[in-house]
Amino acid sequence: MTINLLGALATAFIICAVTGPSFISVLHKLNFGQSIRECGPKEHMKKSGTPTMGGIMMLLAILVAVAVWCNFTPALCIALLLTFGHALIGFIDDYIKVVMKRNLGLTAAQKFFLQFVLAGAYVYYIETHVQSDLSIAIPGTEYMLPLGWLYYVLVFLLLVGTTNAVNLTDGLDGLAASVTLPVTVAYAFIAYNTGHADLSVFALAITGACLGFLLFNHHPAKVFMGDTGSLAIGGGVAALALLTHTELLLVILGGIYVMEATSVIMQVTYFRLTGGRRIFRMTPIHHHFELGGWKETKIVKRFFAASCLLCIAGVLLWLNGNGGF
């Protein structure tokens, strides 16, 4: 099985590395360039026109890697559905913004509806394929907290929250992909040690795709993943949390995602309550550090290191609640 895990990692990486230059060239010819908001950091204006929708090559790499190195089990199929389903939402959003030149893309209501449909697909899966008591594990303990029908609400909140948090994290060159690396490695470990070798292969396929994509997305980025990529990654990570029954642990493993999303919520809430005052210079919080004088590369390195530490802590906590090795 070790060969399958390493094979998936290597295959996804190689596909991204090999197809990247040609794919970026095609995006250039199609004029699929990213438009930069004027309200963002001024340094980002020079990135205008950089090809976006690079998430498509990541998805191709993930699909091929999984198809070559793993059988399509029900759990793997639902993970792919949540990943590619959210990728489709992101692609539609990117297409509207980049091709149709409508900067707002899909409305929030349209996104929520499509995500609700995907959440419904997962609910159908657990009702038909899993004998679940609709409970969640408390990290670091063996206690399972029964939620009943509230578990279905959690599914929707986790999917919407994770996908949008990853989307918010994708605001600097290489940031979302870098932060995701330790998260998917951690989930590969957890999945493998809970008897979900298929999900472990899937997690490492995402890892390989992110590594390959970083060859072209590191600063200065030659391509952006777009909503196509960020929503797909969010869907994949959320699927891993749901299918390994580590919903609450994701708050720790994906702590950077949580921090990014929370900073936006805090900023908007405080702004409205105080009539225009702000807590941070700009959100998501990576822009706060950027406007404070930190270079993009410094922020990405610090956030990556923090993500690694959070994932180590999360895995140790998970081991404590599961009797160790």
PLM regions and their residue ranges:
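Alpha-helical transmembrane segments
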Residues: M1-H28, M58-L88, Y122-T128, G148-F325
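A cross-family signal for N-terminal binding/gating loops and helix N-caps
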Residues: H28-G33, P41, M45, M57
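Peri-membrane helix termini and adjoining interfacial loops of integral membrane proteins
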Residues: N31-I36, G90-D93, H129-I136, I279-T283
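Juxtamembrane helix-capping/reentrant segments at transmembrane boundaries
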Residues: I36-T50, K101-L114, H286, L291
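Short aromatic-rich membrane-water interface segments that cap or initiate transmembrane helices
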Residues: S48, I138-L150
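Hydrophobic alpha-helical hairpins/lids featuring a short glycine-rich hinge
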Residues: F72-T107, K111-F112
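Membrane-interface helix termini and inter-helical loops of multi-pass transporters
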Residues: V99, V130-Y143, N322-F325
